[in-house]
């Protein structure tokens, strides 16, 4: 088991001894690893195949998707959530990552912010003057999936908090798009 970050690469730079070491672990004549090899990372901003391709390029040995374990890889086992409406946030192609793990009903943080601009009381510069057009009966968010740290973590945290406080009523129901988020949170806290 090989950690990627800090062991094979530091930042974007491959550590000088890494390619040479992995050349010794891979038998090019047989086209097979001399020892079982798996690569792990706490990163969650890319797909396993992309990380395998990157490792193959860095180390000059073939690395398959099955040999890569990302921070989000275990979510594939949470099949009870795959049909639920999930809010996904993080960096990279979060919607594509979620769907590749089996989640079928996905809303991204950017989509939610666009549909309900009043929910984002942190980032006023990115707030839209009016919500995007959307289905009047926005489905209840039933789970939140975080793929690593979002770039704008404060906005993501604030909007996720509102979503998590939403276990009795949907914050995205018709007529709540322009509600004051703090009054909204207070209403749910008081009702608990």
Predicted stretch roles:
Residues 1-192:
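HAD-like aspartate-dependent phosphatase fold
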